[in-house]
Structures are given as C-alpha cells and as structure tokens.
C-alpha cells in the first residue's frame, strides 16, 4: 500500500446542494482532518471556532468570510490560515466550495509569514 494518495479533482468529490451546505471528509487521521464544504448561494456557516489551527481555501465561488470580526470578500484561489479558537463565519455569495484542513496535532508549530499581495 503506498504512503500517499492523490485526488485529481477535488471538485468532483462534493455536490453543492440546491439549498444548504454539505461537508465531505477527504482524509482524517491523528494529524489532520481535511474536508470539502459545499454551499449553495446565500448559505451561511454561522460564527464558530475550531479547537485547532486550520487552513481554508476557496476552490470555487465567492464568499464573505469574517475572521475575528474583520470581513473579507474572497473568491476562488483565496487561502486563509487561522489559529485555534479564532471566531469566524462564512457567507456564500454564490455556489461555493471550500477546502478546510484542520491540524489536529497540538505539537505542530506554524510560522505564518506576511500576507502575499500581487
């Protein structure tokens, strides 16, 4: 059995519901939990926190993401790093798919650089 796995197209692993949201786990072990979240336009993931650090990447669509009270208008290609317990919410302005990677190993230290702008 290989020590890797490949997902050639993440967008084929979730369906956006007509009204609502869906979460599909792609991988889960003692280190990370990776899930695809699909939202129909107008759906919201209300304010919440995660117990571990996480990365969010918008793969499709547009969203208003609120991080610790600060609103960001984001679209495909946007990438976010959040420390544990950062209050956040996501409002899908259009049909949207987001990849969430939660770091479950509390001993992992993340060094976050400055924001990259082009």
Please provide the spans of the model-predicted regions:
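A cytosolic small-molecule/anion-sensing beta-strand core signal
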Residues: 59-60, 75-76, 94
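Ligand-binding loop in jelly-roll beta-barrel domains
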Residues: 84-108
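Short acidic-glycine-tyrosine-enriched beta hairpin
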Residues: 69-84
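Structural motif
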Residues: 33, 62-64, 71, 87, ...
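A short, N-terminal "cap"/entry segment at the start of jelly-roll beta-barrel domains
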Residues: 1-31, 66, 115-118
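Short beta-strand His + acidic residue motifs that chelate non-heme Fe in jelly-roll/DSBH
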Residues: 45-47, 65-66, 82, 87-93
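Short, conserved beta-strand element in jelly-roll/cupin
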Residues: 38-40, 49-65
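Conserved short histidine dyad/triad with adjacent acidic residue
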Residues: 20, 33-50
């Amino acid at each position: 059995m290989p020590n890797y796995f490949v997902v050639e197209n993440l967008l084929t692993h979730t369906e956006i519901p007509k009204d609502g949201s869906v979460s599909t786990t792609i991988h889960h072990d003692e280190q990370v939990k990776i899930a695809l979240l699909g939202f129909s336009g107008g759906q919201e993931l209300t304010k919440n926190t995660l117990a571990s650090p996480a990365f969010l990447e918008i793969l499709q669509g547009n969203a208003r993401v609120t991080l610790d009270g600060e609103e960001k208008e984001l679209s495909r290609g946007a990438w976010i790093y959040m420390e544990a317990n950062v209050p956040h919410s996501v409002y899908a302005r259009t049909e949207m798919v987001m990849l969430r990677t939660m770091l479950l190993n509390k001993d992992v230290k993340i060094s976050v650089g400055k924001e990259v702008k082009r």
